[in-house]
Swiss-Prot record:
Residues 1-26 form the signal peptide. InterPro entries: 6_CYS_dom (IPR010884), 6_CYS_dom_sf (IPR038160). Pfam families: s48_45. It comes from Plasmodium falciparum (isolate 3D7). Exhibits a high rate of non-synonymous polymorphism is different strains, suggesting that it adapts to different Anopheles vector species. Residues 416-439 form a propeptide. The lineage of its organism: Eukaryota, Sar, Alveolata, Apicomplexa, Aconoidasida. Mediates evasion of the mosquito innate immune response by suppressing midgut nitration responses that are critical to activate the mosquito complement system. It is unclear whether the protein has a role in passive evasion by making the parasite invisible to the mosquito immune system, acts as a decoy to prevent recognition of another surface protein or anchors the decoy protein. Not required for female fertility. A lipid is attached at S415 (GPI-anchor amidated serine). Its main location: other. Glycans are attached at N106, N125, N324. Disruption phenotype: Reduced parasite survival in the mosquito. Parasites produce normal numbers of oocysts when included in the blood meal of the mosquito vector. This is Female gametocyte surface protein P47.
Length: 439
């Protein structure tokens, strides 16, 4: 018994060491991790809970909406044992190498990764004594629109409770991954005409970039790469996994004008110079509380000192609306509430039948870590970008306070569901119209 417990503890230590190492690598390569933990996390584990004898199982899980290149999706599922997981199973068995295209189909309905146009090397599997660890790495190129699923299914595990009409029943852990084609803006270096220098085997490329562009180039083995003055390109994503193809995804915002150089030299002394240029991002929607509307650094806002004492005024900004606006900012060189806006935001929740704004992590509100943050503490300027449209519509706030006066930035974030609701309404109106005409 002690030996089994010791092995379990060692496994947990090794697991978190693995995650720490992987996290360090991911930070180096600027990837995002989505962890669906059905074993260690008390909020999402699939252990049995007390339910009525006729009740169905509880479902827990996570949704990964449009992950980008190099991102890691991690599934942690307990192994079958004689206790809480006596009838647990992973469906499909070799997830993520195969996955379901419907949440509740069985193992025989699984499709292979080739159906998804993804190479097997992007699916990583590890086995510990108590649990399975499965990782899907989003590839450099993906050109389909699909929603896929994997299940950590403990719903068949049941235990009677003596003297009660209730039972202990396991939960269903569901991983939902929404994949969308997001690579329409790829710049392939091999298809770009270089400027050939006088020196032999030396090439130079001049690349003009836009926000969210993807730069792809092939790098031979044993190539030395150096960066000159490219540190001002914040929030880039880099992926090196695919056959020596290097992919760099540009951020949603360029804080400054960019003019920097990447240089490489391989073992055959072939030299490549890539000159990257980009213009500073302009016309950012947001609220500047130091200038009149239209006069500040952002499109909207007002002078906070013009607000009557003890009153508040709201400045409203929309993200992911019809114009697909994905970035927003606030300028407040005064007291900011919450202090770390936009990482922390005010979000309305109902507590004791009363609606009130409380502080939450924006990543928790939107249920995604795929958020870009930018800040200039000295100027009191902060920005965020949402490269991926959230699944749910949300309304959040940050407050700028000065001498008892409050200027509220209210951010309305549209969702993917809005589009489908609009399509449904159009279809519904067409049906009503034809019914009316035919009468």
């Amino acid at each position: 018994m002690c030996m089994g417990r010791m092995i379990s503890i060692i496994n947990i230590i090794l697991f978190y060491f693995f995650l720490w190492v992987k996290k360090s690598i991911s930070e180096l390569l600027s990837s995002t991790q989505y962890v669906c933990d059905f074993y260690f996390n008390p909020l999402t584990n699939v252990k049995p809970t007390v339910v009525g004898s006729s009740e169905i199982y509880e479902e827990v899980g996570c949704t990964i909406n449009n992950p980008t290149l190099g991102d890691h999706i991690v599934l942690i599922c307990p192994k079958k044992n004689n206790g809480d997981f006596s009838n647990i199973e992973i469906v499909p068995t070799n997830c993520f190498e195969s996955h379901l295209y419907s949440a509740y189909k069985n193992d025989s309905s699984a499709y292979h990764l080739e159906k998804l146009d993804i190479d097997k090397k992007y699916a990583i599997n590890s086995s510990f004594s108590d649990f399975y660890l499965k990782i899907l790495v989003i590839p450099n190129e993906y050109k389909s629109h699909k929603t896929i699923y994997c299940r950590c299914d403990n719903s068949k595990t049941e235990k009677n409770i003596p003297g009660q009409d209730k039972i202990l029943k396991g939960k269903l852990g569901l991983v939902k991954i929404i994949l969308r084609n997001q690579y329409n803006n790829i710049i392939e270096l091999e298809k770009t005409k270089p400027i050939i220098h006088n020196k032999k085997d030396t090439y130079k490329y001049d690349i003009k970039l836009k926000e969210s562009d993807i730069l792809m180039f092939y790098m031979k083995e044993e190539t030395i790469v150096e960066s000159g003055n490219c540190e001002e390109i914040l929030n880039t994503k880099i992926n090196l996994l695919s056959n020596n193809n290097v992919v760099i995804k540009m951020p949603s915002i360029f804080i400054n004008n960019i003019n920097c150089m990447l240089s490489s030299q391989d073992q055959n002394n072939e030299k490549n110079y890539i000159n990257l240029k980009a213009d500073k991002t302009k016309h950012i929607d947001g609220c500047d509380f130091t200038k009149p509307k239209g006069k500040g650094i952002y499109k909207n806002g007002f002078i906070i000192n013009d607000i009557p004492n003890e009153e508040e005024r709201i400045c409203t900004v929309h993200l992911w609306n019809k114009k697909n606006q994905t970035i927003a900012g606030i300028k407040c060189p005064y007291k900011l509430i919450p202090p770390y806006c936009f990482k922390h935001v005010l979000y309305e929740k109902e507590i004791d039948s009363q609606k009130t704004y409380k502080t939450f992590l924006l990543s928790d509100v939107l249920d995604t870590p795929n958020i870009e943050y930018y800040g200039n503490n000295k100027e009191g300027m902060y920005m965020l970008a949402l490269p991926t449209k959230p699944e749910k519509t949300n309304k959040i706030r940050c407050i700028c306070e000065q001498g008892g006066k409050k200027a509220v930035m209210e951010l309305h974030i549209a969702s993917t569901s809005t589009k489908y609701i609009s399509m449904f309404l159009i279809f519904f109106l067409i049906v009503i119209f034809y019914m009316y005409v035919s009468i």
